[in-house]
Amino acid sequence: VRLELLQDAREFWPRAEADIRRAERRVLVQTLSLEGDQAGQALASALRASRAPERRVLIDSFTRHVVNDRFLHSPASLLDGPLRAEVRATRALVAGLSRAGIPVRFTSPAGPLLLRFPARDHRKLVLVDDRVAYLGGINFSEHNFAWRDLMLRIEHERAARFLAADFLRTFRGRPRASSLALPGLELHTFDGRSNARRFEQLLMPLVDAARARIEIEAPYLTQPFLERLVRAAERGVAVTVLTPEVNNFRLVRELLACPVATRGLSVRLYRGRMTHLKAILVDARTLVLGSANFDIWSYHFQGEHLAIVRDAELVRDFESRVLAAGLAGSRPLTRPASAWRGALARLSLRSLERASLFVLGG
């Protein structure tokens, strides 16, 4: 198995674009968000240029409701001319792919009154010729391309076929959870129905078994993952949490600035730009990465990819290059949220979780 970490769009996209353009048999692309800006147009151009006879695109219905990190149905968004122009460009991009003979499907409709909005298909995948697959956190939009993020490039036929089968099940409207074990690498897909059980089987035991240290970088870390990290710290494990200084989700920002919620953890704020990277390093031996944000919604409702990597060379690369850059670009949290703000954030997130479970089941 050949594994490679690609940090940020500047490393990921040139490699993925070259693979797409060289494809001979098929290209499968799955994303939460595809927008009609330079990033989305670059993907569309590469797909149209590919000689592969089979080219398919899966987009979550998120893109029908949120563009450029803006909720499209708010009064301000409805009156925003440039935003509406980007919405039209996004629709034109999708229509252009269809006209080029590239089937496009939207997954996970949000339903009446957007009641199913928490249940997104959050997976990101580029797969070429049952030979190469990319998975991780990067969506196809300019603002996502500007964020700190990470993709895992996997060059292995069995891994590619496994991820292709998962893609095609979802494309046909029949997603299901699945797993593949390879030397130094486990791949797991989550279907949004059995997530809690699978996280408890696959990820939580790694956190619970940590002996010395855990480093986690995540934009939207919440319970139950946060609570397990606090328990690890109570056992004497050194736990470092990297999260964005300027977070586009206010409740999470206030939760992670709350000393009660993060007791025993070293919280560091990544400066200068959003970090959308999601990874956990346990005892400098096991690396967990993929699309999951380690939050309420990934735990219960969202389609996700999870890779558990024990390949020593890749783990060293993550620690020396990716983690080191995150630590160097961050500062310790020095101004905690007030007790009432932290308590309100915790209560609000609990309420959102319970309401979502009531509506969606679970």
Question: Language-model features: where?
Answer:
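Charged, low-complexity intrinsically disordered terminal segments
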Residues: 1-362
